[in-house]
């Protein structure tokens, strides 16, 4: 039963995406592709630049968050895991610590911000990873 579920779900997903691609109407024009500002056409750049540091922290947070959530099954049932589960957990934590040390050595977490104002109405930061 579970095998049929694993086979049927991707097939249904591909069929639905294919039907959407075939039947959907594509009517793009400049007002539809641009940002919405209360129905008025914007006269200047309405999108401000994101800080690269914000995106970098978000990208670095995601793998560590997923790895920490992988520890939860051991925390919930430590007595039924036994010695084998403990060894796997220790190996997993060692790999996590080694990855964190490598990120520190590559200076991926050190953000050296130098403000550049080459373009009007934007804030760009040059992040130097290798000093």
Swiss-Prot record:
Its EC number is 7.1.1.2. The chain crosses the membrane at residues 4-24, 52-72, 82-102. GO terms for molecular function: NADH dehydrogenase (ubiquinone) activity. Keywords: Electron transport, Membrane, Mitochondrion, NAD, Respiratory chain, Translocase, Transmembrane, Transmembrane helix, Transport, Ubiquinone. It is an enzyme of class 7 (translocase). It is a multi-pass membrane protein. It comes from the Eukaryota. It is found in: Mitochondrion membrane. One of its GO terms (cellular component) is NADH dehydrogenase complex. This is NADH-ubiquinone oxidoreductase chain 3. It comes from Candida parapsilosis. The gene is ND3.
């Amino acid at each position: 039963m579970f095998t049929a579920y694993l086979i049927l779900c991707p097939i249904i997903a591909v069929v639905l995406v294919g039907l959407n691609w075939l039947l959907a109407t594509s009517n793009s024009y400049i007002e539809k592709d641009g940002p919405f500002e209360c129905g008025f056409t914007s006269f200047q750049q309405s999108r401000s630049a994101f800080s690269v540091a914000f995106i970098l922290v978000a990208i670095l947070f995601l793998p560590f968050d997923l790895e920490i959530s992988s520890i939860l099954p051991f925390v919930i049932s430590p007595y039924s895991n036994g010695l084998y589960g403990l060894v796997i957990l220790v190996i997993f934590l060692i790999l996590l610590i080694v990855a964190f040390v490598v990120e520190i050595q590559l200076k991926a977490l050190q953000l050296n911000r130098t403000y550049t104002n080459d373009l009007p109405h934007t804030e760009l930061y040059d992040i130097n990873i290798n000093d």
